Amino acid sequence: MLRSQRIIAMNIQPKITPVLDPGFVPAVLWNQAFEAKAAADPASHQVDIALTRNDGTCFRWSGKLLPHTGENIALNETYVERIVKFLLWQKGGNIILVAGDDAIADMLASRYCKGGIREFDWDFIGKKIYGSPIEVKKVSVEELPEEYSGSMTLGRNLDGCRIGFDLGGSDRKCAAVVNGEVVYSEEVVWDPYFQKDPQYHIDGIQDSLERAAAHLPRVDAIGGSSAGVIINSEVRTSSLFRGVSQEDIEKTLGKVFRTLQKEKWNNIPFEVVNDGEVTALAGAMGMNDNAVLG
């Protein structure tokens, strides 16, 4: 959402003006107007951005900017900063590589830093999710890495004796399955949000798994889902653990599923992902299709 003199400079007139927020302009209209303005200016220049992670994952974006002078500076900065913020939340990463405009790189570095106006994103996306603060670097186009996003095969396994669970804000759902047939299912009420002791969560998760295991001759694999950002079965942040200190999350709860796998479940396959991914998986299995949004 964009307002003030930047809208006036772009001369955008939405078809519908919100009564309670007459200055509101949908970002898509602003972006379209900016891109048309840049395309019409022969002095426009290209900027290339790569958003990367420590594991080598890389997402690329390219676009044209207006000559970086006068009133165009505010327009260019608004356009790129909004694009970068969207990419951080859509794709995810902690290193921003900028080629083609050093002034834009400097602007991003001054905003995505401690004390900058995007300090929250700098800390949350960078430190909490990807392990280190967001960093902005100036590079040449030749130095930008190629786009790379490793794919991961998720689930669709029904054979054998398996446990599935979901951690919610009001209850823990757990089921035992034998060759695709549910032999046990239970929802156990719990209150995780403001519990300060990590052991409360650990004991609750293990309790649900043991209840399900009691209905199986053996346990071949465990799969689970939870609210929050979960990468490689490790919790980076989750509303379920909001009462637990960041120190305890990093020390204990972040790797709770790996710890349970090793200490309680003999290192059998034990995978946990975000609950939206499991919803997408269920939809994909039901429709016998791929690329389903959960």
Feature map (PLM): residue ranges:
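Short glycine-rich, Thr/Ser-proximal phosphate-binding strand/loop in the N-terminal lobe
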Residues: K37-A39, Q46-N72, L167-D207, R236-G243
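Short glycine-aspartate micro-motif
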Residues: I95-L97, G160-D166, V219-G223, E271, ...
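Long, contiguous juxta-domain segments that are non-catalytic but functionally important
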Residues: P145-I163
